[in-house]
Amino acid sequence: MSKSPSQTTVMVVDDDQAIVHLVAGILEGEGYRVLQARHSDEALDLSAAYKEDIDLLVTDVKMDPFMTGFQLAQCLRLMRVEIKVLYISGFVEDEMVRWEVESRVATFLQKPFRPQDLLEKIRSVLA
């Protein structure tokens, strides 16, 4: 049985602050607890502080020059193996992004997206 939104913590990571705020606002409106980060280093700091609480990582695929969303997810899984991940990106046409998503059988949502599409994906990932 999955947790209710009020018992679920989601970390949102994207180098575009507008996307972070958009996703956080949608999720908070549904009752989710949200942690926000713009870069991988912020996300890693937050994950160290909240590692037992983070249920879902929503991350951009291509972020900062230090780490991709895939690499960030790998790092977080070392701390919390059961963390779920939803990748978001506006660069699906990029062959590397497509290969990485398909090879991991990952859950992916292409930007731009509608709020209801985001919520459906999140519910699906958490189920």
PLM feature segments, named:
Residues 21-29:
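Charged docking surfaces used in two-component/phosphorelay signaling
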Residues 16-20:
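Short acidic/polar segment at the start of the alpha1 helix of CheY-like receiver
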Residues 36-56, 96-97:
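Acidic, metal-coordinating helix/loop segments flanking the phosphotransfer/catalytic sites
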Residues 67, 71, 78, 82-110, ...:
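Alpha4 helix (beta4-alpha4-beta5 surface) of REC/receiver domains from two-component response regulators
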